[in-house]
Amino acid sequence: MSRKKKVLVKLVSSAGTGVFWVKQRNPKTQTEKLSFRKYDPKVRKHVQFTEAKIK
């Protein structure tokens, strides 16, 4: 079997609520860290989500 080309990364809320999203990323083509503006249901606002490693 071949190795996976994409890795799973966790996008953690910058609001500090502990909410996170899981996304796939190809490390060969996307060298910079992912950052999205998504909805955080705990604060009921759109906030910045930044990439962190899945433990």
UniProtKB/Swiss-Prot annotation:
Keyword set, alphabetical order: Ribonucleoprotein, Ribosomal protein
GO MF term list: structural constituent of ribosome
HAMAP family: Ribosomal_bL33
Keyword Ribosomal protein found: yes
InterPro entries per the UniProt record, alphabetical: Ribosomal_bL33, Ribosomal_bL33_CS, Ribosomal_bL33_sf, Ribosomal_zn-bd
Organism lineage: Bacteria, Pseudomonadati, Pseudomonadota, Alphaproteobacteria, Rickettsiales
Biological process (GO), any one: translation
Gene: rpmG
Family: Belongs to the bacterial ribosomal protein bL33 family.
Statement: the UniProt record of this protein carries the keyword Ribosomal protein: yes
Protein's UniProt name: Large ribosomal subunit protein bL33
NCBIfam families in the cross-refs: PRK00595.1 (NF001860), rpmG_bact (TIGR01023)
Gene Ontology CC terms: cytoplasm; large ribosomal subunit
